[in-house]
């Protein structure tokens, strides 16, 4: 049996380690089991996407490779901020490697494939949106298929946090079905819980939050412009003050990775809002999933788009614990928000049912325990 220095190495985007070390209270859902495993005597390690201690020439080559493969496969790579002699050594000495997104997984899989010739490494990639392939020319499709097939051969488990994408992958990539695991994204309900029973006499305004490119930012601006009698709050880095057309909007710079707002501050905005809205473009990416779950967990009703990538049609029921809209037309969104905003009894019912749903199905410990089953022990 080969010796390992680490039981689990997590490979995260930047900022996770700083947040873990912070004394501020925060939600733990984006650490994908790290806090849970740290209490169980696993030997843990973290690598983050940051400037690596590599030579200038190495960085230039890796940056070129990132751009080349991204251009000709339409996949995502971060090799220039991940690959160095030190990080590869840490990965080689790890029994399990867990990446927090598929771009990181794509950046590492070739190196891990070589390491696997010499020793067993359990390679787990957590993903959302990997299978949302963009239409492209034949050269891109051929290269993408080669890279993608190689990646699927190397990875041990793909963890789908979105049931719709999981169903799509199982249907279209049957050869690799044994590697596909559906673990719906869960949240830290110990943190994202209402301080008191939601009071819709006190709650005011509509909240839009998020910077993911699959949100319909133009529609959000138009909705606020049409409903000038309702106050709106935007928390995003994608809408500038000059983009806003009406005076009923408070525009706040927000980005989870950059930490412009603390989780406590974000939670406060969720709790104060009467509604959260998330207009999403029709994509297989589960855009808005974490924000939607966080809103529900504090008892604030959610209106979002019914897309092919909506995270879980099995547990959510339209107009019972969520409002799902079939298209992103301004009139439909404005009319729905206007009618629901002052319908106190319906808001209370949605709040109660969404809280019940989260506490029954989306507690973080459920995700952590299931993920543990796929570790190499």
Which stretches of residues belong to each language-model region?
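Acidic anion/phosphate-binding donor-loop and adjacent secondary structure
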Residues: 171, 184-203, 244
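Conserved catalytic-core segment of nucleotide-activated headgroup transferases in glycan assembly
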Residues: 198-266
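A short, active-site helix/loop in glycosyltransferases that binds the activated sugar's phosphate group
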Residues: 155-178, 189-191
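A short, well-ordered alpha-helix in the C-terminal region of glycosyltransferases
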Residues: 332, 339, 346-360
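Membrane-proximal helix-turn-helix segments that form the acceptor-binding/catalytic region
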Residues: 85-93, 118, 138-158
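Conserved acidic donor-binding segment of nucleotide-sugar-dependent glycosyltransferases
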Residues: 211, 316-330, 339-344
């Amino acid at each position: 049996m080969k010796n390992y220095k680490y039981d689990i190495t997590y490979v995260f985007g930047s900022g996770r380690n700083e947040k873990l070390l912070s004394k501020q209270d925060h939600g733990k859902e984006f650490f994908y089991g790290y806090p849970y495993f740290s209490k169980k005597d696993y030997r843990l390690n973290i690598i983050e996407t940051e400037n690596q201690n590599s030579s200038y020439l190495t960085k230039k080559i890796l940056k070129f490779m990132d751009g080349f493969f991204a251009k000709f496969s339409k996949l995502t790579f971060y090799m220039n901020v991940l690959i160095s002699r030190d990080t590869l050594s840490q990965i080689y000495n790890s029994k399990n490697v867990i990446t927090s997104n598929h771009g990181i997984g794509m950046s590492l899989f070739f190196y891990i494939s070589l390491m696997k010739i010499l020793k067993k490494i359990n390679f787990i990639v957590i993903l959302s949106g990997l299978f949302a392939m963009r239409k492209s020319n034949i050269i891109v499709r051929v290269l993408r298929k080669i890279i993608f097939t190689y990646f699927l051969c190397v990875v041990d488990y793909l963890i789908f946090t979105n049931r719709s994408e999981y169903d799509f992958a199982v249907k279209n990539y049957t050869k690799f079905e044994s590697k596909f695991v559906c673990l719906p994204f869960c949240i830290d309900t110990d943190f994202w819980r209402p301080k008191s029973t939601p009071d819709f006499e006190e709650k005011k305004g509509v909240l839009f939050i998020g910077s993911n490119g699959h949100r319909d930012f133009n529609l959000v601006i138009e909705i606020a412009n049409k409903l000038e009698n309702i106050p709106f709050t935007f928390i995003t880095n994608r809408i500038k003050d000059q983009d806003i057309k009406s005076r009923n909007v408070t525009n706040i710079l927000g980005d989870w990775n950059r930490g412009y707002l603390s989780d406590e501050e974000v939670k406060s905005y969720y709790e104060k809002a009467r509604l959260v809205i998330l207009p999403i473009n029709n994509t297989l990416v589960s855009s808005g999933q974490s924000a939607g779950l966080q809103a529900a967990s504090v008892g604030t009703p959610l209106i979002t788009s019914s897309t092919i990538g909506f995270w879980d049609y099995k547990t959510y029921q339209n107009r019972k614990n969520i409002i799902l809209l079939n298209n992103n037309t301004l009139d439909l969104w404005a009319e729905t928000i206007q009618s629901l905003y002052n319908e106190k009894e319906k808001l209370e019912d949605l709040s109660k049912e969404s809280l019940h749903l989260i506490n029954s199905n989306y507690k973080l410990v459920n995700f952590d325990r299931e993920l543990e089953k796929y570790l190499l022990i």
